[in-house]
């Protein structure tokens, strides 16, 4: 059994990408379980064709304790017989969101949910790699990490941060980076940019997923593209990514870069102005504001 994880910043399309990819892997005959580790609990809805799955933490709070739950209470089966669990999180502003991940994984292990599987996939929020969110990495649960990113600055910043988290536990937990998945935002020279970032991080861009309205069309119906429109070219993109992950042997210890190097990369690809350009823009802004203030005073 291989344990993989999809990490990425919020809003990058991580859950959509992972569910479409896992649907392709399941169609190839793999027995799969998804463990959603995002407080939004949206890691399984396209597989289950539902709004949001009831989470382990929510049910545990209702029943009194996680020990009062049965496996069938939290584990549902969806498209292509993919098993689905959502760990959930606490009320906003209260407690640690990562606690749900730890609680859910421990419960699933104790209940034998990991038996007879080819892949377990963790779908994890990656804006911050705090102790709870890093749990699949830290405890060696996830052996292969796939980072969903794009050519946008904050997505790349998050990818580099996640690489730092992987490096921290690579020697103790045995976790490795499987590659970057570029979920395209139609940024100029996006393929080249992510390939260079991957090279700097000592990994590969395992696949470039083009932007397509078909993804949103399928999402409106709470389906993956593979289920909603199996003959569409976008479905083939996810099948290709699925095959690449199944056959991937390039698992590496990442080499994160510092923020200055990342900024330099963005400047080289024209996505960020140089320090001189930044100063000019700021000076122009200040001059405009001063002129506006002077005009309003004269009135």
Swiss-Prot record:
Annotated catalysed reactions: N2 + 8 reduced [2Fe-2S]-[ferredoxin] + 16 ATP + 16 H2O = H2 + 8 oxidized [2Fe-2S]-[ferredoxin] + 2 NH4(+) + 16 ADP + 16 phosphate + 6 H(+)
Positions of transmembrane segments: none
Keywords, in A-Z order: 4Fe-4S, ADP-ribosylation, ATP-binding, Iron, Iron-sulfur, Metal-binding, Nitrogen fixation, Nucleotide-binding, Oxidoreductase
Pfam families, per database record: Fer4_NifH
GO biological process: nitrogen fixation
EC number(s) per entry: 1.18.6.1
Post-translational modification as stated in the protein's UniProt record: The reversible ADP-ribosylation of Arg-99 inactivates the nitrogenase reductase and regulates nitrogenase activity.
Binding site for [4Fe-4S] cluster: 96, 130
Gene Ontology MF: a single term: 4 iron, 4 sulfur cluster binding
Keyword Iron part of the UniProt annotation: yes
Database matches in InterPro entries: NifH/chlL_CS, NifH/frxC, Nitrogenase_Fe_NifH, P-loop_NTPase
Function: The key enzymatic reactions in nitrogen fixation are catalyzed by the nitrogenase complex, which has 2 components: the iron protein and the molybdenum-iron protein.
Quaternary structure annotation from Swiss-Prot or TrEMBL: Homodimer.
UniProt-recorded name of the protein: Nitrogenase iron protein
Naturally occurring in which organism (per UniProt): Gloeothece citriformis (strain PCC 7424)
Native organism taxonomy: Bacteria, Bacillati, Cyanobacteriota, Cyanophyceae, Oscillatoriophycideae
């Amino acid at each position: 059994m291989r344990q993989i994880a999809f990490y990425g910043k919020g809003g990058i399309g991580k859950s959509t990408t992972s569910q479409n990819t896992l649907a392709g892997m399941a169609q190839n005959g793999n027995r799969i379980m998804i463990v959603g580790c995002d407080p939004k609990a949206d890691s399984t809805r396209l597989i289950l064709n539902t709004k949001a799955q009831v989470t382990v933490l929510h049910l545990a709070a209702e029943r009194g304790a996680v020990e009062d739950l049965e496996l069938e209470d939290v584990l549902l089966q969806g498209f292509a017989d993919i098993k689905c669990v959502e760990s959930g999180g606490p009320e906003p502003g209260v407690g640690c969101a990562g606690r749900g991940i730890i609680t859910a994984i421990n419960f699933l292990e104790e209940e034998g949910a990991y038996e007879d599987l080819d892949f377990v996939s963790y779908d994890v929020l990656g804006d911050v790699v705090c102790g709870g969110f890093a749990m699949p990495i830290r405890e060696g649960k996830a052996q292969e990490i796939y980072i969903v990113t794009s050519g946008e600055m904050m997505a790349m910043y998050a990818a580099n941060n996640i690489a730092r988290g992987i490096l921290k536990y690579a020697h103790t937990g045995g976790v490795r980076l499987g590659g970057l998945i570029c979920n395209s935002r139609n940024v100029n020279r996006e393929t080249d940019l992510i390939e260079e970032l991957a090279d700097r991080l000592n990994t590969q861009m395992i696949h470039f997923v083009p932007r397509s309205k078909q993804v949103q069309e399928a999402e409106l119906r709470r389906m993956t593209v593979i289920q909603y429109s199996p003959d569409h070219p976008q479905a083939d993109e996810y099948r290709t990514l699925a095959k690449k992950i199944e056959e991937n042997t390039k698992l590496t210890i990442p080499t994160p870069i510092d923020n200055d190097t990342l900024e330099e990369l963005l400047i080289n690809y024209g996505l960020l102005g140089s320090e001189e350009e930044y100063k000019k823009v700021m000076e122009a802004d200040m001059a405009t504001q001063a002129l506006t203030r002077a005009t309003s005073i004269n009135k």
